[in-house]
Amino acid sequence: MAAYRVLTAGRDHRMKGQAWVELVGALIVARVRGEPTEELLRETQDQVLFLVQDAGRGKVLYDTLEMEAPPVDVPWAQRALDEKLGPTKLRRAIVVPNSRLAYLARLTFGEGDYRVFYNDIVLAIKWLSEDGASA
């Protein structure tokens, strides 16, 4: 299986954050650094969905350990993107450094198939590796 890696830094200088999306074994890993914007989340979602379709994987690890908390409208933008997923099923583990980002992650992903982990990438990977609704 070929490895995929995408760096998304936005199309203009106003972008405050960066994201990397790559296929690592059976998982799609999305790393977000800095303060994300709605555009960055949209581009990251596009890359995640590309890999979901191309590699046939629906388990996604979001590493937000180096992310700064964005304004609350940014997580709502991600929720709107998720409402457009249609039949695509994702199982997501979100690794956060603090309670503020954990709260924003819960706002972002609502009632989806996800779990938030505090600073524990190993446990997040273990959870994703278990049999779940989305493979």
Residue ranges and their predicted role:
Residues 2-135:
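Amphipathic, Lys/Arg-enriched alpha-helical "gate/interface" segment within cytosolic domains
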